Amino acid sequence: MPKKKSLTTRRVLALFLTYITLCVAGGVVSSILFVPGVMSVNSVVKSVVPSLRVDGIDFDVTALPQKSRLYASDGKTVIATFYAQNRTVVPLRRISQYMQQAMVAREDRRFFEHSGVDVQGVMRAFVQTFIKKSDMQGGSSLTQQYVKNVLMIKAREDNDPISEYHAAESTVARKLREMLIAIQMEKKYSKLEILQGYLNVAQFGSNNLYGVETAAKRYFNTTAANLNLVQAATIASITKNPSRYDPSIEENQPESQKQRNIVLDLMLRQNFISQKEHDDAVTTPIKSTLNIQHEVANVGCQAAGDAAF
């Protein structure tokens, strides 16, 4: 019996080391050989599953699908607005500091320390998934989450359901691919550029609602630049489960307030806010903060009545 236990331990350790080695290898490949190294990995990946490639993908942090507006002959009156994803892209300077801090606190507290992959997060996810045998855990850095979102957008634009499936599936292969690309991204873009990209690409509610500018308008009738602490924490809390935590749905509001307060707790723990700011914010009923703009949630075509025709 002791011998069998020892063997199991060695196997678990070997699996753990293999997993971490692959993560680190991605970093070494990217930092030393960069594109040639990634291409060599990519050729192996594509031979197994073609849609799991890591090359030839545009990750421009500003090139995201936005709304298109149809104007009347006067060039000013908006007749209709068309979109696949309800999003308005804004630069980081037009996103409040509270919103930036809330997002980092919620999604990746070591964002400004790692190089694209949060090794501690990966180790925690490994233990939960492979040793404790729980569901596949996250462990993804904010950069990796940005990569995942862009891969899904790219697949939809290309009308490629296979690539879209692989971009979202809960597998180690997908995680490793995201790690490789995330490390590449952090060589090309600054942390602030990546944070800007994520704040514009992430889903912040049901009804195809993406990006903090649209979320600010939808929930509070304001702009991303003017979001206060409570509003920012509310929006940051949504990304974990956009349908369940969407505060515009009345039955979601108790859970939405709970999730908002979790974000506020994290912001306090990470020294983004003071104890007084935290205490004042967590006692604020979420319903009293909302100013829902229902027209912002229209999906696919936001039209000006009969004028659209």
Q: What does each model-found stretch correspond to?
A:
Residues Q275-F309:
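Non-catalytic structural connector segments
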Residues M1-R69, T77-V78:
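N-terminal type II signal-anchor transmembrane helix
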Residues L64-S274:
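Peptidoglycan glycan-strand catalytic modules in the bacterial/periplasmic cell-wall system
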Residues V48-V49, R156-A167, E295-F309:
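Charged, glycine/proline-rich intrinsically disordered loops and linkers
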